[in-house]
């Protein structure tokens, strides 16, 4: 039964609080959806979807379970199994078979999670993001072909185009849709939505629904996209900035992106402890890096280095200064690493909180003893990206989250529903 976008995404909301895979028993969206709506512990048709997220820093598998009570009725999202491996496929740029073996490892998770009787009708798809976008096309395709062979030799349903590199803007749209449906923002007649900020290793995305005509008029061509849902048309501002992910920004800050070679050269920064001499591998390339043995060190000189990476490089829609945004991925991780938020629960921060923590970490590099040596640089980059890149105000509130109602944030769930819609799959 192929369904419309509106029907498909109704699946996301209806039954997230009480699931097979998560223990929390709670009524979500009180007054809108009740826990009694969830078809748990009933005789129901069950079907599954497998979505691989091949990011720059790791490969993740999402196994979603859906139930359908009766034919002709919309199915419900019942739960998610999530696992991951590191490093990402791009680290195997010259060993594509080894890269594909990491996917095979995760595919065993799907076999363990899905009954054998459902294997041949469960679709499996891998979508690669910025890590593979940055590779030479021939090398990226070699990796994808090896993964495709793994899929073809699996017991699962392998649709056409099952292994591909996803467009960055599409990534942002699906993450926005997922978050806003899981938070119940798109279920009334109004359009009280939240924006989304995703910071990966190699790219970053910003997506929101503009409320002011001025934003639509002043936005560059290619930053706006429309889609229809619930008999409404949503015109989103969305853009993916390749090379502005957290780890790609480290290379840019160190000056390693412009370097013709890395052998024998140590890249230095005021964002690193003065005594530091270390190696770092990203995208299959090994870099030597260290602190400034002579010269300045701390937040101010670090900020000056990072500012060169972002200033004047990103579009700044004025509207974001007063908008509500959900932020995840490395925004969440670095906030949790520095105790700005609870690691499990997340929390709400102001943009200025990232700057405060960056100053605290960077101005104490002399006593740095544990954790990531890049912590000062990462926090400073996040601060500069939000303020000088996107143009957020110091007081702009950000909801930092890893999961919404026990489901991973990001684009994977939205992509799975789109996949099921295109294949016409129900129970």
Swiss-Prot record:
Assembly: Monomer; active form. Homodimer; disulfide-linked. Homodimers are enzymatically inactive.
Protein name in UniProt: Ectonucleoside triphosphate diphosphohydrolase 5
Range of residues in the leader sequence: 1-24
Keywords: Calcium, Disulfide bond, Endoplasmic reticulum, Glycoprotein, Hydrolase, Magnesium, Secreted, Signal
Catalytic site: 171 (proton acceptor)
GO MF terms, alphabetically ordered: ADP phosphatase activity; CDP phosphatase activity; GDP phosphatase activity; IDP phosphatase activity; UDP phosphatase activity
Co-factor requirement: Ca(2+); Mg(2+)
Signals that turn on the gene: Expressed in response to phosphoinositide 3-kinase (PI3K) signaling. Activation of PI3K results in FOXO phosphorylation by AKT1 and loss of ENTPD5 transcriptional repression. Up-regulated in PTEN-deficient cells.
Matches recorded under PANTHER family: ADENOSINE/GUANOSINE DIPHOSPHATASE, NUCLEOSIDE DIPHOSPHATE PHOSPHATASE ENTPD5
One BP annotation, GO: UDP-alpha-D-glucose metabolic process
Cysteines joined through disulfide linkages: 271-302, 362-376
Catalytic activity: a ribonucleoside 5'-diphosphate + H2O = a ribonucleoside 5'-phosphate + phosphate + H(+); GDP + H2O = GMP + phosphate + H(+); UDP + H2O = UMP + phosphate + H(+); IDP + H2O = IMP + phosphate + H(+)
Biochemical pathway: Protein modification; protein glycosylation
Function text: Hydrolyzes nucleoside diphosphates with a preference for GDP, IDP and UDP compared to ADP and CDP. In the lumen of the endoplasmic reticulum, hydrolyzes UDP that acts as an end-product feedback inhibitor of the UDP-Glc:glycoprotein glucosyltransferases. UMP can be transported back by an UDP-sugar antiporter to the cytosol where it is consumed to regenerate UDP-glucose. Therefore, it positively regulates protein reglucosylation by clearing UDP from the ER lumen and by promoting the regeneration of UDP-glucose.
Subcellular location: Endoplasmic reticulum; Secreted
EC number: 3.6.1.6
Statement: the UniProt record of this protein carries the keyword Hydrolase: yes
Tissue: Ubiquitous.
Enzyme type, top EC level: hydrolase
Disruption phenotype annotation: Mice display hepatopathy and aspermia. The hepatopathy is progressive and characterized by centrilobular hepatocyte hypertrophy, oval cell proliferation, bile staining of Kupffer cells, and hepatocyte degeneration with increasing incidence and severity of degenerative lesions, development of multiple foci of cellular alteration, and hepatocellular neoplasia with age.
Organism listed in the record: Mus musculus (Mouse)
